[in-house]
A protein has these predicted regions:
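Acidic, glycine-enriched loop/beta-strand segments at the rims
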Residues: 73-83, 397, 405-439
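Metallo-beta-lactamase
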Residues: 129-133
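Short, surface-exposed, low-complexity cationic segments
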Residues: 461, 540-558
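Active-site neighborhoods of metal-dependent hydrolases
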Residues: 1-50, 196-203, 207-222, 244-248, ...
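Hydrophobic, small-residue-rich alpha-helical packing segments that form membrane-like cores
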Residues: 113-122, 140-278
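Histidine-rich, glycine-flanked metal-binding segment
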Residues: 35-65, 72-125, 453
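Flexible inter-domain linker/hinge segments
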Residues: 1-62, 466, 474-512
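C-terminal, active-site-flanking charged/polar segments
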Residues: 425-465
Length: 558
């Protein structure tokens, strides 16, 4: 069997290279858990049969579900072809699939009662974690799931001015509403308060999992310090949208207020909000975890023009007021937008997110992240001594998965494909990688993916569309998803949250920084020239030209 026929049947072998959509990125498979000539394969006349590669045993002794022979791209696993065993919603084993009674070296025991997801020729990633979502519409869930996002840290509960939710009454209804979608959910409480009472109330009584300090509601010294003090006491994260007008604090002042305490700096480039013109200075600071939102990724020719209208709309500005118009324009800087891409490529910004409906697009974070990776490869080049982009691909994958999970205390449950974690796994056809997933498994159960004509003879008959699977119907979404809350909510003991989801306490959010992120731990001195807009890192200038076009875009979407 020649290599192309083998790959078409069993998936690529170790050493084979795979193109990722039209991104310009290529991965090389580092290892293959299969053994040549004795492969596990389901189908008519294949080896996944009783007495061959299926063990005759109770399901509890094997797996509920197995994903066979899939290429994993994961910051923890690397890029490997393996099978993934799932039991009771969690990853229970990774490696070679089969029957240990007939095969040697079996890691994933597949039984006669195991359901099989054929992963040959597909790519598996951990479900993306979006930590910056303004939940102004319930339809955001559809866009997120259809892009491979399985965990959301949100603010608001509809078209209300919130920037964080503190009311236990509102959080109770919000958690209840989310039981309709197969997505893990956590809420940020509003941290812009000089008094700690509403913050503690949000955590202990409402079930919030962190705070959002936002300039529109107050990002001054007292509010920021109060949020950080409560966060330190309760082990939750503080997300910061800093003082763009520099009314109370400059970027240097904000860093002093932190006093070395951990913070997650949202849209650290600044167009989405933050100290004008040099909030990007916070990137590379050891206690600041920086993230980007997707409208500026990758930096393109229309980015400057596009953002004026978005800023005006989201922040309720009046364009006929000269002061409002000037405030909007001051936030838009081509120099920092271009430098943002380079800082990502260097690993100095470790997270990407959407800022959905708060100047971002819920369904575009994954594809814009890899479009940025492709742009950086084209602009900055690939390593001369290798014929693949594994290092770059894994760095950008970490920005979507494990790093946001680490920042918000979720990494013990989600963010990577590791034994013991929830089986939130996204399967992609290589030609659609980053743009449109083939299947989204939530706790190992089909939740969203490609569906065909329901009246057709087979499930692959056109038209093929992305839509809900059985995991998105009935009571199942709540059963296969979790609610991330503060430990204080679990300790409270009084059940004010009607959600049917399992509640999981966030942890490990304090005393961390870029050094704790995967593959994105670069620190250094970032400066922005206030006259020219030139950005430097440790004195070296950072420039990136606006792209005329972006990958993973028009080829896949009308």
């Amino acid at each position: 069997m020649n290599p192309y026929e083998y790959a078409a049947t069993h998936g690529p072998r170790a050493g084979d290279r795979v193109r990722l959509g039209d991104s310009g990125l290529t991965i090389r498979v580092e290892s293959d858990a299969q053994r040549y000539g004795d492969e596990f394969l389901a189908g008519f006349g294949k080896t996944a049969r009783d007495g061959l590669h299926l063990k005759a045993a109770a399901v509890r002794e094997t797996c509920d579900v197995v994903i066979s022979n899939v290429v994993v791209i994961d910051a923890a696993q690397g890029i490997r072809k393996v099978s993934i065993g799932i039991r009771e919603g969690r990853i229970c084993s990774i490696g070679r699939a089969g029957n240990p009674d007939t095969l040697d070296g079996v890691d994933v025991v597949v039984g006669t009662g195991t359901s099989i997801v054929s992963g040959e020729g597909l790519i598996a990633t951990a479900g993306a974690v979006d930590t910056h979502v303004h939940l102004l519409s319930p339809r955001i869930m559809e866009a997120s799931l259809a892009s491979g996002v399985t965990t959301i840290i949100g603010q608001e509960f509809g078209p209300v001015w919130g920037v964080g939710v503190n009311s236990p009454w509102a959080l109770r209804h919000a958690f209840n509403a989310f039981d309709a979608w197969p997505v893990n959910i956590g809420f940020l409480g509003r941290g812009s308060s000089s008094d700690a009472a509403p913050l503690v109330e949000a955590l202990a009584e409402g079930g919030a999992s962190g705070f959002k300090v936002h300039e529109d509601m107050g990002a001054h010294t007292r509010a920021l310090d109060t949020a950080l003090r409560v966060a330190e006491e309760h082990d939750v994260q503080v997300a910061l949208h800093s003082d763009g007008l520099n009314e109370c604090l400059s970027v240097e002042d904000t860093l002093r207020v932190l006093e070395g305490r951990t913070i997650h700096a949202f849209h650290i480039e600044g167009c989405g909000g933050g100290h004008v013109p040099n909030v990007l200075k916070m990137a590379g600071v050891p206690n600041v975890i920086g993230s980007s939102t997707n409208p500026t990724l990758p930096f393109g020719r229309d980015a400057v023009a596009e953002h004026y209208g978005m800023i005006v709309s989201v922040h309720d500005l009046k364009t006929d007021l000269p002061g409002d118009a000037a405030m909007a324009r001051d936030r838009i800087r081509a120099g920092t937008m271009g430098a943002e891409d380079v800082l990502h490529d260097l690993g100095a910004i470790g997270i990407t997110s959407s800022d959905a409906q708060g100047m971002g697009r819920a369904g575009e974070t994954v594809r814009r992240t890899f479009a940025m990776a492709g742009k950086m490869k084209a602009e900055r080049g690939a390593p001369a001594d290798v014929d693949h982009d594994n290092e770059r691909v894994l760095r950008y994958m970490a920005k979507l998965t494990i790093n946001p999970a680490i920042a918000h205390g979720l990494a013990h449950e989600v963010g990577s494909i590791e034994v013991g974690k929830l089986a939130d796994i996204v399967l992609w056809r290589p030609e659609f990688f980053g743009a449109k997933p083939q299947l989204v498994l939530k706790s190992g159960f089909p939740a969203y993916g490609v569906v065909g004509d329901p009246n057709a003879a087979t499930d692959t008959c056109e038209p093929l569309v992305l839509g809900p699977q059985f995991g998105a119907h009935g009571a199942t979404p709540a059963e296969i998803s979790v609610a991330f809350v503060a430990q204080a909510a679990l300790d409270q003991g009084n059940d004010l949250m009607p959600t049917r989801r399992r509640r999981v306490a966030v942890r490990g959010t304090r005393g961390i920084g870029p050094a704790d992120l995967r593959l994105n731990s670069r620190t250094g001195s970032v400066d922005v020239d206030q006259r020219t807009g030139l950005v430097t890192l440790d004195g070296d200038p950072l420039r990136s030209e606006p792209a005329d076009s972006a990958s993973l875009n028009r080829l896949y979407f009308l």
